[in-house]
Amino acid sequence: MNKAVMNKAVMNSENTTQDQSITTTDLDFDKLNGLLAVVIQDAKTQRVLMVGFMNAESYARTLETGFVVFFSRSRNKLWMKGETSGHTLQVVSMSTDCDRDALLITVKANGPGVCHEGFESCFSRTRVNNNWIVSDPQTFSPTDVYSDTKEVAK
């Protein structure tokens, strides 16, 4: 992935593609106090795995490394998804919304799940008859994976 620019092919009026470069300065980090909302989607299954946030620094680190790096609002620091569990998110593609204040990142998920509660997706609960139920099986044991951290308690 290019370190300075995210490229997106777009259709022009002659129905041919042209390259449109989006730099960090083209993204609107101001709407959410220096952050972008980031939706993470599995490139193979198209399932939404999680939602996180990036600041300009974590966005740049993501472009540099090719792995998703978030900004943690609760810890007030950068964190690469999988730095504790090994369940990293390798960037396949990135898209921005029309306001350029949110990103959709499709990824190759390296590991059995992304949720710190042991699920493939953080969206593992479904509303049924006015109740939230766990609708997915756990894909790993959070106690085993995060035995030396506070991640399980979050």
What residue spans do the PLM features occupy?
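Compositionally biased, intrinsically disordered low-complexity segments enriched
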Residues: M1-E14
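C-terminal binding/interaction regions
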Residues: T16-L35, A43-L49, M54-K154
